[in-house]
Amino acid sequence: MREWFTRAAVAVALMPTPAFADELKIDDLVVANTIPAPQRDATVNAAKGFYQFWNIGDEALLKAAISPDFTDHTLPSGRPQGPDGPAFASKTFRAAVPDLSVEVRKMIVAGDYVTVHMVFRGRFTGTFGKARGEGQAIDFIATDLLKVTNGRITDNWHIEDNLTLLTQMGVAKVEQ
């Protein structure tokens, strides 16, 4: 069974995708073999576009990847709901970490759902609230669960390692 998933993952990785999605590096892509090819391709491309948006900040990628009915089920305080939320989050975070990049370590596609484990990296050279960056290295993990319908992301549940992020920024201190 695992061998079949591996072959399917290789096939998906080799299929043609939009140019923006080709730029995104995914370390490990696993796709369930029960997904019809058109749905599989649309789902993988939506997810790739979404994470390429996070990788480079181009809002055209975001608009192509998410539905107008997008819902963030783990909406942080102060972030707008809907399609404007990820754009707001990206702008806010890029003000603190202008060279922000994302590496997708694992993407698992099963039916309408995509689970993604990623690493965000960059240097804190901007501002975050009252904190001013001094070039600190930023390197923290996050995991998303996306629902994709008709090739567009409709729902997102996400969790980020904010303690590591805030500690790296010097905003939080962990006493041992």
Tell me the role of every PLM-derived stretch.
Residues 119-150:
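Exposed beta-sheet edge and beta->alpha loop/turn motif
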Residues 1-8:
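Bacterial N-terminal signal peptides that target proteins for export
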Residues 139-167:
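Short beta-strand edge/turn micro-motifs at domain boundaries
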Residues 14-21:
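C-terminal segment of classical bacterial N-terminal signal peptides
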Residues 21-64, 68, 174-176:
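Short, low-complexity N-terminal intrinsically disordered segments enriched in polar/charged residues
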Residues 66, 108, 120-122, 160:
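Short beta-strand segments enriched in hydrophobic/aromatic residues
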Residues 8-9, 19:
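Cleavable N-terminal signal peptides
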Residues 42-45, 59-111:
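A solvent-exposed, acidic/Ser-Thr-rich amphipathic alpha-helical stretch
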